Amino acid sequence: MTIRSVEELEDLLSTPSPALIEEMAQLKGDILILGVGGKMGPSLAKLAIRAIREAGVDKKVTGVSRFSEPGLKGELEGYGVETISIDLLNDEELQTLPEVENVIYMAGKKFGTTGQEHSTWAMNTYLPGRVGEKFKNSRIVVFSSGNIYPFMPIGSGGADENVAPDPKGEYAQSCLGRERIFQYASHKYRTPLLIYRLNYAVDLRYGNLLEIAQMVNEGREIDLTSGHMNVIWQGDANEIALRSLSICDHPAKILNVTGPETISIRWVAEEFGKLLDKNPRFVNEEASDALLNNAGQCHRLFGYPRVTLREMIEMTAHWVAIGGESLNKPTHFQTRSGKF
């Protein structure tokens, strides 16, 4: 599979599976996406619109954001997504949002946390309390992070949902705070809810694979200390988020979302080296542990991701070779301190 343009990439990301189309046909009510302006939100909204259209049902998708990125609001509206431009932390504005049956909560702050901890905690932990109360009668899929888990031994298969959280650093702590506050709302109001613990969605414009490919292509050193990772194609991650609306429950269900492999960064870099005709440069040796998730429960519910690791590697190498667009949003996936 080769992607030659942003338009082809957006088309791939927004192509629904037959299973998603069927579930959108059965799902009752409209969909509200809070925090639609991030890396994943626009393609999730477009995926929802396409699935609804192909299902032949009448359902609105509304995206909520400050829309600070020029052109995004108009782009989404042109696709059929209704938009509402507000600051979610402004409670008066939050209360003006329409009541809907289905909410996908994507709002959050990660990068720039160090030195702005108060802002991160407000967005990641205070706001969920206000949202949980406002939408207590809705189904809610809450985007969270695999960062809430402890580092796991490389041979462990990663942390599954039964592993106790042990967040490192204030970002991860605030993410666990978000989960706990939404769980409180679920208990208090009997709100059906799913906590969606994602680690490392990628498309060709951002993510771990792009960063490794760029380092190989540019001859930069690759630090192998955090030498293993998980990834999942953003289109698959978005599809799982939408399909998770149908399994929200009380008390809140927890679901790890990532690909099936524990991936060696050394191996990935060497594969990029072959495809880009470059010799990867490595420093340090692999630690015995890393931030790894086990998404076996997710795969049992929804099947394996449609886009494979090998396809992601080949598409990313081609994208880098042709000088494809980058969002210039580093993931800092090699960070072990928990500081972002």
Where are the predicted features?
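Amphipathic terminal alpha-helices
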Residues: 2-24, 309-340
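Conserved Rossmann-fold NAD(P)-dependent oxidoreductase catalytic core, especially the SDR/UDP-sugar
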Residues: 30, 102-105, 110, 126-170
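N-terminal Rossmann NAD(P)H-binding glycine-rich loop of SDR-like oxidoreductase domains
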Residues: 30-50
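NAD(P)H-binding glycine-rich loop region in Rossmannoid oxidoreductase-like domains
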Residues: 42, 67-71, 75-123
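Short-chain dehydrogenase/reductase
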Residues: 121-125, 157-179, 202, 230-231, ...
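NAD(P)-dependent short-chain dehydrogenase/reductase
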Residues: 176-230, 234-236, 272
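Mid/C-terminal beta-alpha module of Rossmann-like enzyme folds, strongest
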Residues: 240-297, 337-338
